[in-house]
Amino acid sequence: MDEENDMREWSLDDEILLFDLMCDFKPAGHDKDKQMSIIVEKMNENVSEGTKPFSADDIWKKLGGMYDLERVDELEDYIDEDEDSAEEDGAPNEKEEDKKEDIDQSSKDPDSSGLSDVETDMASEREELEVPKSGSRGNNKNKKDRVRKVDTKEDSTAVETKDAEVTNENEDANDDGDDNNEEEDEGNDENEQEDPDDDDQDDDDDENESGEGSLQKRVTRGARKHQHELSDQTGTPKPKKRTRSSAKLDAVETPPPSKRSQKTATPPAQQTPTASAKRRKKSEVQESDADKSNTRRSKRSLVPATTPSKPQAPPIRRSSRKK
C-alpha cells in the first residue's frame, strides 16, 4: 500500500517531456547517474507550485515499467568499452597513418614534394574506385551480357548474309532453268514443224502394208516379236521394218489422226486475242513474216525504175517468247 501511495501520477505532458530528455540524455552505461541528474533538473524546472518535485527514484520506476534497463545497460557498457579501449590503445586512424607516411617521404626527399602530392591523390582515387565484390560481379555480368549481345548480333548478320547468298544462287539456278526451258520449247517447236513429214511417211508405210489405204494400229515391240515368231512358224512373209525410232514406238501405242485429215476436215478456228493468250506458234510467225515481205514487195514495185533494185534479204526469224 505504501508503494502505491509513493507512486507518482504522471500527466501526458510530463511523459512527453521525459521522452524528449531521454533522446538527449540517455541514462545508461557508465554515465547513467550523471545523465539521470540532468534529467531530474530539467523535469523540475517545469514543475508548478504545490506539486511534488521529481526524484531519480520516480523516473527510474517509470522507465523500469517500460524498458528492460539491465539489458540496455549491458549493451551500452559493451559499446563504451570498445570506445574506451580504442582511446586507451591510442591506435591512430588509417588516414592519419597515410598522412604520416607521406610526410616522412617528403622529408626524406625534399625534391619529391610534388610526387608525394600526386601519390596522395592517386591513393584517394583508388579508395574511391574500390568497389565491393558484389558490385564487381554485377559489372562482370553486365560485361558478359554486352559480349553476348554483340555475339548474337554478329551471328544474326552472318546468317542474313548466308541466306542472301543462298537466295542469289537459287535465283541464278532458276534463270538457268528458264533458259533451258526456252531452248527446249524452241526445239519442240522445230520438231512440231518436222513431224508432218514423219506422219506422212508413216501414213505411206501403213498404206503400203495394208494395201487398202486403211490405217493400222502401231505395234509395240512385244507384239512385233510375236508377229515375227508367228511368221516363222507359218511361213508368211515378215512385215517391213519400221523407220521410226524405238523410243517413239514405246511411247505411243495408238497413232494420232493425221494432220492432213485434220486440215481437210475442219478448218482452223479463228483465235480471238485475249489478255492471257498463249504465245504464237512459229507457223503463225512465219505467216506474219510472209505478209510483211509481201507488203514490202508491193511497196518496192511502186518505186520508180531509176532506183537500183536491191536483192531481197531473207526474213529474220524472231522468237515471240518473252525472255
Curated annotation (Swiss-Prot):
Residues 92-111, 148-165, 283-294 have a biased composition (Basic and acidic residues). GO terms for cellular component: NuA4 histone acetyltransferase complex; nucleus. InterPro entries: Eaf7/MRGBP. Residues 218-227 have a biased composition (Basic residues). The keyword Nucleus applies. The keyword Transcription regulation applies. This is Chromatin modification-related protein EAF7. It comes from Debaryomyces hansenii (strain ATCC 36239 / CBS 767 / BCRC 21394 / JCM 1990 / NBRC 0083 / IGC 2968).
